[in-house]
Amino acid sequence: GFGSLFKFLAKKVAKTVAKQAAKQGAKYIANKQME
């Protein structure tokens, strides 16, 4: 039903957000190391 579809989408979004956050975090750490 609708609930399972919503859960599926939420999982996908969470994964994408986590990936983006990891990228941003790595960039931030790299910049800090450069200083």
Curated annotation (Swiss-Prot):
Top-level taxon of the source organism: Eukaryota
Tissue expression: Expressed by the venom gland.
Localization per Swiss-Prot or TrEMBL: Secreted
Keywords noted in UniProt: Amidation, Antibiotic, Antimicrobial, Cytolysis, Hemolysis, Neurotoxin, Secreted, Toxin
Residue numbers bearing the Glutamic acid 1-amide modification: 35
One record GO biological process: killing of cells of another organism
Pfam families: Cu
Major localization listed first in the record, in broad terms: secreted
A Gene Ontology term for the protein's cellular component: extracellular region
InterPro entries xrefs: Cupiennin (IPR035164)
Single GO term (MF): toxin activity
Nucleotide-binding as UniProt keyword: no
Family: Belongs to the cationic peptide 04 (cupiennin) family. 01 subfamily.
Function: Has antimicrobial activity against E.coli, E.faecalis, P.aeruginosa, and S.aureus. Has insecticidal and hemolytic activities. Probably acts by disturbing membrane function with its amphipathic structure.
Protein name: Cupiennin-1b
Organism encoding this protein: Cupiennius salei
